[in-house]
Amino acid sequence: MEKYEKLEKVGEGTYGKVYKAMEKGTGKLVALKKTRLEMDEEGIPPTALREISLLQMLSTSIYVVRLLCVEHVHQPSTKSQSTKSNLYLVFEYLDTDLKKFIDSYRKGPNPKPLEPFLIQKLMFQLCKGVAHCHSHGVLHRDLKPQNLLLVKDKELLKIADLGLGRAFTVPLKSYTHEIVTLWYRAPEVLLGSTHYSTGVDMWSVGCIFAEMVRRQALFPGDSEFQQLLHIFRLLGTPTEQQWPGVSTLRDWHVYPKWEPQDLTLAVPSLSPQGVDLLTKMLKYNPAERISAKTALDHPYFDSLDKSQF
């Protein structure tokens, strides 16, 4: 790790501390993710190795943050015979994320909506990145604006905090004891379903889409119960007809029977094609949700010059 100079701690990721650092030889900025690893006798656990090779494979897409290399640091532990081991994942450094970007349009001296063309461009890249991950059998499971990094001058979006699903399980609280946000979590996950698939990410993509249009979260719940109420109030309480098996899910209660509202009211500035795409992302039945790959061919993107992607 001598070849990097840590400049500042930029956050506590879901899996450990994140530093902005400079590669001393080149002056290149990188993001260092320090992950805590329980070492076994053989060294790095095979699950972690699998995840890292997955990350390297996914890095081939321009819409996924690039994993540049992995540094393995041993620190002999004074208390016991074992060595404490840290794994540093070295990623390309990006200066902002979608949450900060949306906030810059909402706050500040000159608040204004994001241009429809810009939303379209960012959404296309997000769907491309998610389609890439899904085509390799990887679910993100925690997509949110904070995990989408931006190269502002190029209007380029990249998915971060990816793939560390099984070796580093997503905790309910992060290391700083911030509650991990529920705003982008799919209803089947909130209801305790253990079998979930690519639809969980597409629900999150829909919530992010609406948030770019509204400049505020679509479903800002502060508990799992509240989160479901937010969803049901807008989209109506799901029925067995709409979503077979919903009433058998672990945390299903008898909720008030709300009728669905017109989604247009939540995103008044979105074009009819945009509302149609959003509706397909926010289907209750995960099997009916549009896939990322199919979304790329949706009429909402017809006016976009796709050759630039």
From Swiss-Prot:
Limits of the Protein kinase domain: 4-301
The name this protein carries in UniProt is: Cyclin-dependent kinase B1-1
Question: Result of mutating T181I?
Answer: Decreased kinase activity and disturbed cell cycle
- EC class of this enzyme? transferase
Enzymatic reactions: L-seryl-[protein] + ATP = O-phospho-L-seryl-[protein] + ADP + H(+); L-threonyl-[protein] + ATP = O-phospho-L-threonyl-[protein] + ADP + H(+); [DNA-directed RNA polymerase] + ATP = phospho-[DNA-directed RNA polymerase] + ADP + H(+)
Give the induction text: Repressed by MYB88 and MYB124 during stomatal development.
- What does the record give as the active site? D142 (proton acceptor)
The organism of origin for this protein: Arabidopsis thaliana
Tell me, what is an example of a GO biological process annotation in this record? Answer: regulation of cell cycle G1/S phase transition
